[in-house]
Structure formats: C-alpha cells, structure tokens
Amino acid sequence: MAKKSMIEREKKRAKLVEKYSEKREALLEEFRTTESPLEKLEIHRQIQQLPRNSAPNRRRNRCWVTGRPRGVYRDFGLSRNVLREWAHEGLLPGVVKSSW
C-alpha cells in the first residue's frame, strides 16, 4: 500500500492538470502557430509561469485500491496484484483465465 501522502499528492496533481488544461493548451497552440522568435519567447515564459504540477506528464497512474504506482493496467485502473486477485475471485466481469 502506498503512503497516503503520495496518493493525496497525485490527486492534487490531477486537480491542477484539470484546472490549467485549457490555458496550457491555448498557450501551446499559440506557441506552435507563432513564427516570431520574440513572441515564442514570451509565450514560453507564460507557460513556465504555470504551476509545474499542472503539466499532464507529471501525473502517475496509480492503482485506485492500493495506490501502487507500477504495474497498473489502464483498462481497470488496478495494479497487477489486485487484478489477479479480483479476477480469481470473479469480481471482474468478463475477465477469464487464459487457456489454449
């Protein structure tokens, strides 16, 4: 189980990403379309003024049950350990053990 502080930190990052996503996207689009180096420099400064944790690539996928940061399946939002346990217990509809 991950530390509660790490889980809360990740939730805070998710809120920041949500809050600044429109502004960040607008600035990035303007940066891509602008050709003037001075204007690009100014836009880059504006992007740098945004909170660091508002960048989407700062987020980390975590298991919503245990908070484990590695081995998380995106389709379920579960770590491999919890996924295996729940699949064996039949708690995940449509998930069956592989056989060939």
From Swiss-Prot:
One GO term of the biological process aspect? translation
Recall the GO molecular function terms of this protein's record. Answer: rRNA binding; structural constituent of ribosome
- Matches recorded under Pfam families: Ribosomal_S14 (PF00253)
Cellular component terms per the entry's GO annotation: cytoplasm; small ribosomal subunit
What are the UniProt keywords, alphabetically? Answer: Ribonucleoprotein, Ribosomal protein, RNA-binding, rRNA-binding
Q: Which InterPro entries match?
A: Ribosomal_uS14 (IPR001209), Ribosomal_uS14_bac/plastid (IPR023036), Ribosomal_uS14_CS (IPR018271)
- What family does the Swiss-Prot or TrEMBL record give for this protein? Belongs to the universal ribosomal protein uS14 family.
Per the entry, what this protein does is: Binds 16S rRNA, required for the assembly of 30S particles and may also be responsible for determining the conformation of the 16S rRNA at the A site.
Self-association state and partner proteins as the record states:
Part of the 30S ribosomal subunit. Contacts proteins S3 and S10.
Q: What is this protein called?
A: Small ribosomal subunit protein uS14
